[in-house]
């Protein structure tokens, strides 16, 4: 009898690891010391636009999973149980960001008033489509990327040292650096428990790669010294070859 192949989570980790170099570079560039304070303020506003969509996304995926469970979908029950727990864990993180924004010297309206950037809509909006018109299991790819590329453990001290900001302006970065590794382990354990078909595993992977691409474009945008976007073809290419 032949040995079992790599698990679903292992395949996803390998796939992301092969394609995440541009995101990691964009994140490193984003956190450089030069002009970090205004860039950090923009980062907080952008992350609020992302994070405030996450719990509603999971709530909608939970609703769909409950309906699918009634119809006998074998993924739906375990997926619904995971989403219930993760919704509780993520609730209120948008409020953390508003508090950080205020403590960093900006106004909550700086995050709440502007229309979120198209790249944020692309990141979250695709998930709504797949939840509604395909299967909520695709959302696991999105979660894997957001949890898997959380702030580094030493980032809080670097920001504080460079900007002089107080701890009250750094809660989101600090908490997510501590929490997201455990959250990612839970997600990958779920992936390995689910009776995924090859097609469903591919759905999760496509969602993850799209999320990786959108998150890369967001960090490239945030890492620019000026807020204005570069002309097309002037910036680095995204993992899918789309200019951010």
Please place each PLM-identified region on the residue numbering.
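Non-heme di-metal
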Residues: 2-244
